[in-house]
Swiss-Prot record:
Swiss-Prot/TrEMBL keywords: Cell projection, Cilium, Lipoprotein, Myristate, Palmitate, Sensory transduction, Vision
The organism's place on the tree of life at top rank: Eukaryota
Disruption phenotype: Deficient mice develop severe early-onset retinal degeneration associated with a disorganized outer segment, progressive thinning of the outer nuclear layer, microglia activation and non-responsive to light by 8 weeks of age.
Residues with a covalently attached lipid (N-myristoyl glycine): 2
Residue stretches of biased makeup (Basic and acidic residues): 126-168, 535-547, 580-598, 972-990, 1091-1100, 1259-1279
Gene source species: Mus musculus (Mouse)
Gene name in the database record: Pcare
Composition bias type Low complexity, residue spans: 1076-1090
Compartmental location: Cell projection, Cilium, Photoreceptor outer segment; Photoreceptor inner segment
UniProt protein name: Photoreceptor cilium actin regulator
Family matches, as InterPro entries: PCARE
Lipid-acceptor residues (S-palmitoyl cysteine): 3
Keyword Lipoprotein: yes
GO BP terms, alphabetized: detection of light stimulus involved in visual perception; photoreceptor cell outer segment organization; protein localization to photoreceptor outer segment
Function: Plays an essential role for normal photoreceptor cell maintenance and vision.
Length: 1279
């Protein structure tokens, strides 16, 4: 290239930053002229940074010395300006960042050119620019360039001199002078930054102060209005009552005679008001006076500051103008010649080369464009400055505004820079919100116009940055960014008031103008050497330009690169680089905007937001329908199974906690629950059959769970979309039973209440679907809430027994979760119901059983319940089916216990067996009826407490059923259909059922035998009870169908768990907690004669039983007296009801003890649990069973007696508060049957309370009945 690398560097720096210096000096200088009044911010000084370049170096030095004070000011101003760019950056988000900072770095890097004479100005400008970031480099470069004292610079200068024919190294004084000038300018930059920072703070303060002042004015304006209102109202009052305030004077009446109390009071009050007004007036007046005086003094101070600042600005501008004129004075003549001589500086070589370099520099600046984009606010001013004075040109040539070379300080420059400064100040002040106040009025006007226009049009290019000529290189770059036309527009907009002065020069600053400006040089430089040098400089500049952006690249270019727009190669031609890069830069800005808009994170956030909003809408929209439908379907089922009455009460809190947990867990829990609800409502009902079929394995839970898994996603979306309180409320409403659902607690005694039906107690067929739904609910909790739920895994994978265990476990887990503490029990029961639903699966079978039994058993067991119940006991496996139907948690437990005994066919076998066994069992029941009756009395008391227990007893006839009933009992105990039973039952019955269910499997066989014999003995009297139980029987019909007879026959077993609690409650609890079989054995072993002993023993063991069979007790707690009566009648009536109603009491008791005592106890325990869970169904069954048992008067009388008492106790247990109240009705119903044994009724009722079905028949004796009532309270307490 002919130019040494140093030359290239110099040329590059000159071409890039040097041109910028030339341009910017003019821009700054014009601003500087205006600076005194309208350029409060020494942005002009920044521009004036270039001024030094124009003057000779020694002159620059002298100027530096002369302007030491002004230089300090300039430094402060420079700092302020630097701060101002920062402040403006804060104020102008678009990148008001002053090019002062970044551009200077570029300049320092770019401009190491050596300027001769007037070109020194360019050098100065460059140094001033780079001084901020690269002050050392800049100065050294300036020294090298101007003085070439550095070896490399000198070598390059010498080389360039030789190459350029007579290049002259800069004299030392010149270099030193320029060094001093640059030192001054650099320090001035930091000072300007400080000034800008202060101004920004002041503008911010003003922005805060103005609204406060406005508020102050408003306050006093309002106060004045109130005072005026008081005054006006007083005037109106005086006009109205002027003559009526005193007694009317009448002739002849002494004035003193009139009482003056009212007048005195009024006068006193008025005086107080006057004093108050004086105080208020003093306060307001003093405050207003102080405020006005303070504001006036502040205004005076501000005016003084303004005048002082203007004077300083004038001095500073004068010094800068002199500095510039001195630097440019020597170079006037040499300006034409020296460019060739001092090709090193790149100035002499530059007319065309510099012009092209200028464009190249613009390309480079475009490279900086992204950076400058930040500074665009200042860019406009800089651009205009560069356009107008673009060639540093000190454009004495092109800037003919005021003075060709002094022009930098001359008015044109002043106009340009001043608007820039004004804009800068305005940008700070406007963004500060008080800027106008901060800046002088004229400058405010100029600033406001340029700033507003610029700020609105090109806030990035606000004159602020321009005025911060400190960033000359950036301004050049930005100018390059902007097309000349844009620059002109910017300049015109920026300088509206004064800019128009600069406008003429700015059009000159257009590329054509610059070319014309450079043309003088270019003409002189047209010689071959000059042209060659120009080419070399272009190349070097292009390289240099490429190199320059790199240092700033980490800061500035990063943004550009991020913008995605690549700056065109700097080597581009002037026009090409100028137009293209600018557009590209803009496109880059657009790209940046697009990139932000298209930011995947933002898009994801927006998508999530929209999705959440949509989910919220869907959730709320579906919330109503879901709540309506799922409340009708799922809520009843969920409420009944998942949320026992206690659960219903707890449900709101648990639902909330679940909802919170689900929120933390991505709404997995709640959505699953919601899904469960929907599954209950629709998938569960729809999938009842599939779930039933799969209930053994708990596929029901899984199956429904899958459905819920589908719904849960939607639900989760909805919930996530609306994790708000409304959604929580919706969830609470969904999870918590509706009033109808809650009714089961109160309506448990009602047996056939729709609430019970919803709970699955009154209406067994719905219950099964509900339980199926519940099973899905459990599976749902397993799926989504299953985070810690064991049930979820066990349900899908476990076999029937395992499933029931998993149900039990899940019940515990759910209970532990407290989110579904009641539901877990019931939900577990519900899964058992799911198992019942599948008779094959025992739980599904149970649901099918109960469904089949529900119609069949209700029909058959109402007439044959007493008989069917023994058979139901015989089919304990179906009991699992019944429990699954009867209650969620019991079926689970039962499914575990009866897993092997569960048979899908058993559900229907239950129905058939209930009918057939009701018929067939009488003979076998003859033996067990004594036991059964003993238990029946005990159970009768229990069934009175928990008539549900009686239906369960009916369900117990078959071993499978008894198991099913055991879980069902557990379920019902869990299902807190009896309010206490549900509360206590769920907790107790679940453990009990769990513990007892394995043993109950054994009991199932024994209990089935007992139930078979018991239905025989219990069946006759049970018809009446079934009639009574029939009301509860519908819900329990599956259980009740087979249990009716069994319940009544088995009622002792069922009640046995219930009434045995007192006598055999230890066994019951042992059975459930320790060894149900032992309880069963003890129950069978106990004879009616033992009844008293057992009752005593049960009293002793009630403590144990209360612990083990708290659920049973809670289930059967209702009527102690009724239990005694029911038990005695049951023990007596079961033998009578059964083949030998009269004398079988002890015989069945013995038989019961021997064969089915344990089973009956287990069954009765199971049923007790189930009854506790679902007392109402039993109550209804008890009524229907009574009616059916009434077919056999003796048996009916006794069994009805027992079951009436049991119903009384059951209903009382269900109603807990009305055990005795219901007893009288039961006593009345029993009175016809057991008129002679009304006393027995009282004891059977107590026996029902104590009878857990686990105690020996003897415990069912009247003697037992007495302790049983006590044990019942214990159980209640325990539960």
């Amino acid at each position: 290239m002919g130019c040494t690398p140093s030359h290239n560097v110099i040329v590059n720096s000159v071409a890039k930053s040097g041109i910028q210096f030339f341009k910017k000096p003019k821009a700054i200088l014009p601003g500087c002229q205006w600076g005194s009044p309208k350029c409060p911010i020494p942005l002009l000084v920044q521009s004036s940074t270039f001024c030094d370049s124009g003057g000779e170096l020694h002159l620059g030095e002298r100027l530096v010395e002369e302007t030491v004070s002004s230089s300090k000011k300039l430094q402060a101003m420079a700092e302020g300006v630097r701060q101002l760019p920062k402040a403006m950056e804060g104020l102008i988000p678009e990148s008001q960042t002053f090019q002062v900072n970044k551009p200077q770095g570029h300049r320092a890097t770019d401009i190491s050119f050596r300027t001769e004479g007037s070109h020194g100005t360019q050098e100065v400008d460059f140094s001033g620019k780079e001084s901020k970031e690269n002050t050392p480099q800049e100065t050294s470069k300036g020294n090298r360039e101007s003085v070439c004292h550095q070896p490399d610079s000198q070598d390059h200068c010498r080389q360039s001199a030789t190459e350029s024919k007579g290049r002259v190294d800069f004299p030392e004084p010149l270099v030193k002078a320029h060094q001093h000038a640059y030192a001054y300018l650099h320090t001035s930059l930091s000072r300007y930054e400080a000034i800008v920072r202060l101004v920004q703070q002041a503008s911010q303060t003003w922005g805060l102060l103005r609204p406060m002042l406005n508020f102050l004015l408003l306050c006093f304006e309002e106060a004045g209005q109130l005072l005026s209102e008081i005054s006006k109202d007083g005037d109106v009052l005086l006009q109205e009552v002027r003559g009526d305030l005193a007694w009317p004077l009448r002739k002849g009446e002494p004035w003193e005679q009139h009482p003056d109390l009212l007048q005195q009071l009024l006068q006193y009050t008025v005086s107080k008001l006057r004093a108050l007004h004086g105080t208020v007036a003093a306060l307001t007046g003093s405050f207003l006076e102080g405020s006005s005086s303070c504001l006036r003094s502040t205004a005076g101070h501000l005016e003084g500051k303004l005048s002082t600042k203007r004077g300083i600005d004038e001095c500073l501008l004068r010094a800068l103008g002199q500095l510039e004129s001195l630097t440019s004075s020597h170079g006037d003549a040499g300006l034409l010649g020296p460019p060739l001589c001092s090709e090193d500086s790149g100035i002499g070589a530059d007319n065309e080369s510099v012009h092209s370099v200028e464009k190249l520099g613009k390309q480079a600046s475009w490279d900086f464009a992204a950076e400058l984009g930040e500074w665009k606010p200042g860019t406009a001013a800089q651009v205009e400055a560069r356009p107008s004075g673009h060639a540093w040109q000190e454009g004495p040539y092109w800037t003919g505004s005021d003075r060709p070379q002094d022009c930098p300080l001359s008015s044109p420059r002043i106009a340009k820079v001043q608007p820039a400064v004004q804009d800068e100040a305005r940008s700070a002040s406007t963004s500060g919100a008080g800027a106008e106040a901060v800046t002088s009025g004229p400058s405010e006007a100029a600033e406001s116009l340029p700033w507003d226009s610029l700020g609105a049009e090109i806030p990035v290019r606000t004159p602020l940055s321009r005025s911060s000529g400190l960033t000359d290189a950036p301004s050049l770059s930005e100018e390059e960014d902007c097309s000349p036309e844009e620059e002109d527009e910017l300049s015109s907009t920026d300088l509206h008031p004064e800019p128009q002065k600069a406008l003429p020069s700015r059009p000159r600053s257009s590329p054509d103008t610059r070319e014309s400006l450079f043309q003088p040089y270019s003409k002189e430089l047209r010689n071959p050497q000059a042209q060659e040098m120009i080419l070399k400089m272009k190349e070097a500049i292009s390289e240099r330009i490429k190199f320059v952006p790199e240092p700033s690249r980490p800061q500035d270019w990063t943004e550009e690169e991020e913008g995605g727009t690549v700056v065109p190669p700097r080597p581009r031609s002037v026009s090409g680089s100028r137009g293209g890069p600018e557009r590209q830069r803009r496109s880059q800005s657009e790209g940046c905007l697009k990139s932000h808009v298209e930011d995947p994170t933002l898009q994801e956030l927006r998508r999530v937001q929209t999705d959440l909003s949509r989910r919220l809408e869907v959730f709320y929209a579906l919330g109503a329908t879901r709540q309506g439908q799922s409340r009708e379907r799922c809520l009843p089922s969920r409420a009944s199974v998942l949320w026992p009455p206690t659960n219903c009460r707890v449900s709101p809190s648990s639902a909330i906690s679940k909802f919170k947990a689900s929120l933390t867990q991505n709404f997995s829990i709640l959505p699953n629950q919601d899904k469960s609800i929907f599954q209950k409502g629709s998938p569960c009902f729809d999938g009842e059959q599939p779930c039933q079929g799969k209930a053994e394995k708990l596929p029901n839970a899984i199956f429904c769970g899958k459905k819920s898994g589908r719904a849960p996603r939607d639900n989760e979306r909805d919930i996530r979309a609306c994790p708000t309180r409304p959604s929580v409320k919706t969830l609470i409403e969904t999870f918590s039973p509706t009033e109808s659902l809650r009714m089961p607690r109160n309506c448990r005694n009602l047996g056939s209440s729709p609430c019970l039906r919803k709970w699955g107690v009154p209406a067994m067929p719905p219950r099964f679907p509900i339980y199926r739904g519940l099973a899905p609910l459990y599976s749902k909790p397993q799926i989504s809430p299953a985070a810690g739920w064991r049930p979820s895994a066990p349900f899908p994978s476990l076999p029937l027994a395992e499933v029931s265990e998993s149900e039990d476990i899940s019940g515990d887990v759910e209970e532990d979760l407290e989110n579904l503490p009641p539901p877990p029990l019931e939900v577990l029961m519900d899964k058992s119901f799911a198992a019942l639903e599948c008779p094959e699966c025992s739980q599904p079978a149970g649901s099918s059983l109960e469904e089949t039994l529900l119609p069949g058993l209700q029909e058959a067991s109402h007439p044959k319940r007493t008989w069917v119940s023994p058979r139901l006991k015989a089919s304990m496996s179906p009991m699992d089916l019944l429990p699954s139907k009867g209650s969620g948690s019991s079926p689970r437990l039962h499914s575990t216990r009866s897993g092997s005994t569960r048979i899908v066919g058993d559900s229907r076998k239950l129905t058939l067996d209930l009918n057939s066994k009701q018929t067939a069992s009488p003979s076998s029941e003859a033996k067990s009826r004594a036991q059964i009756q003993a238990r029946a009395e005990t159970i009768a008391g229990f069934s009175k407490q928990h008539q549900k227990a009686i239906p369960w007893h009916h369900t117990n006839p078959t071993p499978g059923q008894s198991r099913t009933l055991e879980p069902s009992l557990a379920r019902f105990s869990r299902d807190p259909h009896s309010s206490e039973a549900s509360r206590k039952g769920p907790e107790r019955s679940l453990p009990r059922v769990r513990k007892a269910s394995p043993q109950r499997a054994q009991w199932a066989s024994q209990g089935d035998r007992r139930l078979q014999s018991l239905p025989s003995s219990h069946g006759p009297s049970q018809p009446g009870l079934p009639a009574v139980l029939s009301s509860p029987s519908p819900p329990l019909s599956p259980r009740t169908l087979s249990p009716p007879a069994t319940r009544k026959t088995t009622s002792p077993p069922c009640q046995h768990p219930q009434s045995n609690p007192a006598p055999g409650s230890p066994p019951v609890r042992r059975t459930e907690t320790n060894t149900p079989s032992s309880a069963s054995c003890s129950s069978p072993s106990v004879s009616p004669s033992r009844g008293s002993k057992d009752s005593i023993h049960s009293e002793d063991s009630e403590a144990t039983t209360a612990k083990a069979s708290r659920n049973t007790c809670s289930i059967f707690y209702p009527a102690a007296t009724s239990l005694f009566e029911a038990k005695s009648s049951s023990s007596t009536s079961h033998p009578q009801m059964l083949p030998e109603p009269g004398g079988l009491l002890r015989t069945p008791t013995g038989g019961w003890r021997g064969s089915s005592g344990q089973r009956l106890r287990a069954d009765s325990q199971k049923r007790t649990v189930l009854n506790a869970l679902n007392p109402l169904p039993f109550v209804r069954r008890t009524a229907s069973d009574r009616q059916r048992q009434q077919g056999d008067q003796l048996q009916q009388s006794r069994s009805d007696w027992e079951f009436h008492s049991c119903q009384n106790s059951s209903s009382s247990s269900s109603s807990e508060e009305n055990p005795k109240q219901e007893l009288p009705p039961w006593n009345n119903s029993r009175v016809p049957e057991l008129q002679g044994s009304s006393t027995k009724r009282a004891s059977p009722l107590e026996l029902c309370v104590l009878g857990h079905g686990l105690q020996p028949e003897a415990r069912m004796n009247r003697g037992q009945d007495r302790p049983q009532p006590e044990s019942q309270p214990q159980h209640k307490e325990i539960s």
